């Protein structure tokens, strides 16, 4: 998943998993 730093995904609030 493309998270990053608090992405709009609402799940990944860190590294790009």
Curated annotation (Swiss-Prot):
Modification Leucine amide occurs at: 17
GO terms of molecular function: neuropeptide hormone activity
Location, primary (coarse class): secreted
GO CC term, one of those recorded: extracellular region
Keywords: Amidation, Neuropeptide, Secreted
Key word Secreted present: yes
Localization annotation: Secreted
GO BP term, pick one: neuropeptide signaling pathway
Family: Belongs to the pyrokinin family.
Function per UniProt: Myoactive.
Protein name: Pyrokinin-5
Species this protein is from: Blattella germanica
Source taxonomy: Eukaryota, Metazoa, Ecdysozoa, Arthropoda, Hexapoda
